Amino acid sequence: MFDTDTISRFQQIETPFYYYDLGLLRQTLEACKTASDKYGFHVHYAMKANFNPKVLEAVQSYGFGADCVSGNEVTTAIANGFDKSKVVFAGVGKSDKEINIALDADIFCFNVESVQELNIINDLAKAKNKTARVAIRINPNVDAHTHHFITTGLDENKFGINSWQLNDVAETLRSCKNLQFVGIHFHIGSQITDMEVYRSLCIRINEMQQWFEDRGFQVKVLNTGGGLGVDYHNPDTNNIPDFESYFKVFKDFLHIKPGQEVHFELGRALVAQSAALVSRVLYVKMGQKKNFLILDAGMTELIRPMLYQAYQKIENLSRKSEDRSQKSESESQISNLKCQILKYDVVGPICESTDCFQKDVELPESFRGDIFAIRTAGAYGEVMASRYNLRDAIQSVYSE
Ligand code: LLP
């Protein structure tokens, strides 16, 4: 991702900024498209992961749909070229204003998360003399002892409709004349790398599909949600997720009926590896107990490490040639003569103790002005940035 030319280019640019490798993004999208096309699967990009216009432009150019979670995302998706017939709208708290935006835009469907929401969408559609297509988001409520997907799938989660409410759902769907039932929707969590979890999801989807069919509903769409994870530890050697194995699980374990569509809502897997947060060292504080590298980026630019204790690889690009992790043992012995490897807490400038990207990171001895990259920052990075401390809005730089 960072050749010498790119690193010298960074030296001329004010930091911090997000760097997007658009070539890698396209390769990732291509890999996903090829793997999903093989089975005729439909992918909606979960644009909450990143709605940078250049990212949206690339994603939509491959013909993916958009999975939106606000009225603004619906409007932005369509304004950026996504086909409205491939836009879905999820979220536990859709406001009337947002539902109206989506009705006016004639999107493909609402992923509905409560019985009350079904009634509201029906009323608003009726007022416009329209029919709203709806899919029911089901909370799988799976016992953690037998299945792995506990992240969003239990009764105490706010997401989705619990199975004990499904009779109400069926009744409401029958009585609401301005709703058209298209299918069932699930989303069990994010950063899932164990394919066994998806196998368990398939079993649950099959059961739910049967439940609806037994009651006379035709399930045209099976929407499995998103969640495919990426390798945060190896952003160079494992930068494109294994889409083939992922889709194959669904091909093998879902009971797909003739004419039925299978939908996916991938966010992170499509965009995470294609960007890094680039920052400079402002100050180096060498202490008796701790050494601190104080960067000019902090939790305001990338909050995942602070909010979720998430690991994102940190590299000193200015001393990349000296980085022991990039070299063979003999090479690193030679370079260790020149450069020391030290442990640092890599922190930001924000007035919060939690503003720390990672503690005790082993790095080549680093100096004021060194350029750092925090890798795998393309998903839930730029979009979660804030202006706290009245920081400048974060800028973006793109590969040529
Ligand atoms: N569909 C639904 C209904 C979702 O709630 C999400 C993500 C996705 C699809 C896309 O999931 P993905 O493929 O990106 O895993 N900010 C957190 C992640 C929050 C995910 C929220 N929902 C993070 O930085 O790890």
State the predicted function of each range:
Residues 321-340:
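Arg/Gly-rich low-complexity intrinsically disordered repeat tracts
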Residues 4, 260-320, 338-400:
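Charged (often Lys/Glu-rich) extended helix/loop segments that serve as interaction or gating elements
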